[in-house]
Amino acid sequence: MYNASTLRALGIGESARVLEISGAGDSRRLADIGLVPGTEVRCLLRAPCGEPTAYLIRGAVMALRDEDAERVAVEP
């Protein structure tokens, strides 16, 4: 059993594995940047105003808005 959360809930320096992406809208765009089930993601930093947040995804740093990060279910 795992303790699922969202990508948005990760603290700076924390890592997690992607479980699934909810919603149909931009799921393809998120998959194109490497957010697919099984991918390890690490939260690197948040902008001073709170968003976007930078994540390390498959060796590349990507910035995601909170609304996108909330759609990504992860497990520690």
What are the language-model segments listed below?
Residues M1-P76:
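Compact, glycine-rich, soluble single-domain proteins
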